[in-house]
Structures are given as structure tokens and as C-alpha cells.
Amino acid sequence: MIYNCKRTATVESCNYGTLAALKKENFLELQNSTFENIIEVFKKQICLYDDEVKMFLAFAMEKISYFKHLKLLTKQEIFHSMERVTYEKDALLCKKGDIATKLFVIQDGIVEVACKYAPRIDEEFVIERLGRGSIINHRSFMLEDDADTDFRCLTSVSCFELTADKIKEIKDKREDMRTAYRTVEEEVLIP
């Protein structure tokens, strides 16, 4: 409800547990009428969750230079804006010439980065094979740049996706994300 995503944490009960549910309309009523800053309090509490998926994403995303300088709440918003998607073997994540609209963080599987030798030769030259923790399009999806190569699933691939639209929503709300955008634009567009 807070991040408009399906999950914010994995909860395991080792002995027994009590489960409660709060409908979205009741949550919104609580937010609007009772506590002015309840969302921020909840977001700060979510930061304390020791969740395997969150830790994996945090570790992987720290490889991105602009991500390192973001505030913790901005990082959390990014994590919870990602969607887990599974692709079958031979599926294309990106095709050469297509506009990059998503950032991908590979959780499981192998993605092959390849290009054609020459227009008349049908064989592909494999540039690299990307595995768990690899990130695809971390800059180009922000700039809506076109892909220079094909990204094909060598095996079935499970990954987390962040759309350009979602990152723009975060940018509109968070000053540190706007700064990150400017940094990327300066690095890429200004020689």
C-alpha cells in the first residue's frame, strides 16, 4: 500500500504467528484523518526489515555509481517499485535498436550479450554472459537511449525490472533522484 507494490517484506513464522490485514481504503482513511506523517513512519520502519530480496537488490544496485549517493528512503522506493519477472530461454530482454525502457537486475539465470559480425553473416559474436547480480540498462533506461546489442536469455531468467516511468515518478518526488539524473546526463551526453 505504501509503495503501491505487491510486497514490502518476506515474513516467516518459526513458531506461530498472528496475521492482520488492513484494506487500502481503511489505510487511506487512517493516513488522511489520523496521522499526518504515518507514511514516513512506515517507510522508516520498512527500512529496518532484514529481507533477503531487499539485501540482494541493495548489494547489486550499489554497483551503480549514481545509486550509491541516494538517500535510504529513495533506495527503498526504488526497490519496492521493481517487479519480479521470469523470462523463458531465448527470450529477448532488449533488442538492438530498441529504446531502453527498463532496468533489469538478474536474480537467477544467464543473459547473453551478443551482436552480429556483419550484415551478411548470420552468426553472432558473444560479447559477454551476465549472471546473478548483473544489471542491464542502468543508464540507458533513464535517458531512453537505444540498445547497442541484443540481450538474450541463455537460460530461463528471473529478474527484477524497474520501468523508466517508475523512475521518473520517483524523480518527481525526490531531490536526490533528480540529482542522479543530472549526473547521468552529464556523464553520458557531455563529452
Language-model regions: role of each:
Residues 1-191:
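Cytosolic regulatory regions built on CNB/CRP/Popeye-like sensor folds
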